[in-house]
Structures are given as C-alpha cells and as structure tokens.
Amino acid sequence: MKLLVKAPAKINLSLDVLGKRQDGYHEVKMIMTTIDLADRLELTELAEDRIEILSHNRYVPDDQRNLAYQAAKLLKVKFNVKKGVSITIEKTIPVAAGLAGGSSDAAATLRGLNKLWNLGLTIDELAKLGAEIGSDVSFCVYGGTAIATGRGEEIEHIKTPPSCWVVLAKPHIGVSTADVYGNLKLNRVTHPNVDKMVEVINHGDYKGICDTVGNVLEDVTFAMHPEVARIKSQMKRFGADAVLMSGSGPTVFGLVHHDSRMHRIYNGLKGFCEQVYAVRLLGERETLE
C-alpha cells in the first residue's frame, strides 16, 4: 500500500523569546503560518520490519538524523507496529532554512502513517507525539496559523491572515539555531508585540500585519551573517510591504499584495540570491480526511 502526503513550510510572522527554561530550551511566544511551498512524501508499506528514507537531495539524511525517520520510529515503538515503511522525500523546501522543512516532513509522516498503519489517532494525539520529535512538529501536524508557546509545542489556533504573496530568499549559507540562541542577549533586543499581531490577524488587517511583523532573533543572525541583513535590505528596496527573517534564518521573506510588485521583487532577488520562491499563504488547517 502507498500514500502521498504534502508537507508545507511555515514562516514566523512574529517570534519572541521570553527566557531560558530549566530543561535547556528557550521559552518562546510566536505566530507561525503555513505557506504554499511544500515537500511531498511517498509512504510505501513494507512487509519487513525496517524504516527506509529515500531522496534525490544529498542534504537529506537517510538515517535516524532525519525527523521523518524519527516520526516513523516513534509510531512503531509506541504502538508496537511490526510492519516497515519506505519514505521517499521529494524536497522542495530548502534545507536548514528556518522554514521547518524537516519538522513538516516529520508531521506529514505522522499523519500519513496514522492512515497507512490504521492507528486511529486523532490530530491532537498526533500533535502531542510530534512534540517528542521537535519543537515545530506539533504546529506542522496542524498547519494553518497559530500562536506557539512553551518551547513551541503548545499550540493555539487563530484566524488565517488575508491572502497575499510571500517571496522567500535563502542565501547559500547554513545557520546554527543553537548558535543563534546561544548569542541571544534578551536584555539587549527589541521584543516584537506578539499580542498585537494576534489582534490584527483576527481583524484581517493586512496593513496592521505588515506594520507588526517582528523577530527577536534577527539582529543576532544579522551580526553572525551580514548577507542575511543585505537580503532584507534588498527586499525592502524592491518594494515588499513587510520583510522579516523566518525562524533563526537564514531565509528572509517579504509579504506582497500586488502581483506586479511580487514579480519585480522576485526577479530582482534572482540576480542576488541563490534560492528565491514566490508562493501564497495557505488557508485552513490540515485535516485527517
């Protein structure tokens, strides 16, 4: 038996860090929303009791380092599944980009194997399992738009922002999330107004959203990788309505309302940055149907 599952990327419209927890993680408060840039996973049931990861992308690990592998392993162990699975990942989301590509692959694996192996789990149960794999996996199980708190695994759903273009640009560098958080000095940063962002999203206020975007990690990543700051400046210069780094970077995104301006920004960045995408915000949450 075979199943195809979509794994959409996310961006952060607002990201704040409140402090460091006793378990070593940071306490966060952020707003994430899914976008129409997605990996595609093909899950094929195997009679043998093993997990196989396949991908043409050389940056995708084919062992237990892969979060999709970890998701399959978790379900096998928790529910004593004796079957195996082959997971083919068609990678579209850039790797290590601040877009939750690996987390979304894990979430898609949880949703897909729930069907393939007839586990009968609810989406809330899958999200709870996702938290055992990684901080963003719970959100990725649901998709849509949500406030994420705790270490990112506590999810409260809110309305979806008004539809618009999202232009993404990723430089050819990797950013260590651990290094970014390690260099964060909470008493020396400007904290975004996450509550205000929730308010303007719930009112469908596109201009308010553009005025309120913020990411407390930006200045840290910019200091470590000045090319990320340069991409943000270029995107602003080309006329994006709002520009922000997603997650710990290095991907920068711009929100754009008009098609003509989207094309201008996209074409302008293509000569400046290796990976550029123009996609839409996604609509509602994922379902198990």
Curated annotation (Swiss-Prot):
Pathway the protein contributes to: Isoprenoid biosynthesis; isopentenyl diphosphate biosynthesis via DXP pathway; isopentenyl diphosphate from 1-deoxy-D-xylulose 5-phosphate: step 3/6
GO MF entries: 4-(cytidine 5'-diphospho)-2-C-methyl-D-erythritol kinase activity; ATP binding
Catalytic activity: 4-CDP-2-C-methyl-D-erythritol + ATP = 4-CDP-2-C-methyl-D-erythritol 2-phosphate + ADP + H(+)
Record keywords, A-Z: ATP-binding, Isoprene biosynthesis, Kinase, Nucleotide-binding, Transferase
Listed InterPro entries: GHMP_kinase_C_dom, GHMP_kinase_C_sf, GHMP_kinase_N_dom, IspE, Ribosomal_Su5_D2-typ_SF, Ribsml_uS5_D2-typ_fold_subgr
Residues noted as binding ATP in the record, renumbered to the chain: 94-104
EC number(s) on file: 2.7.1.148
Any one of the GO BP annotations: isopentenyl diphosphate biosynthetic process, methylerythritol 4-phosphate pathway
HAMAP family given in the database record: IspE
PANTHER family hit by this protein: 4-DIPHOSPHOCYTIDYL-2-C-METHYL-D-ERYTHRITOL KINASE, CHLOROPLASTIC
Family (UniProt): Belongs to the GHMP kinase family. IspE subfamily.
Biological role stated in the UniProt entry: Catalyzes the phosphorylation of the position 2 hydroxy group of 4-diphosphocytidyl-2C-methyl-D-erythritol.
UniProt name for this protein: 4-diphosphocytidyl-2-C-methyl-D-erythritol kinase
Species the sequence originates in: Bacillus mycoides (strain KBAB4) (Bacillus weihenstephanensis)
Primary gene name: ispE
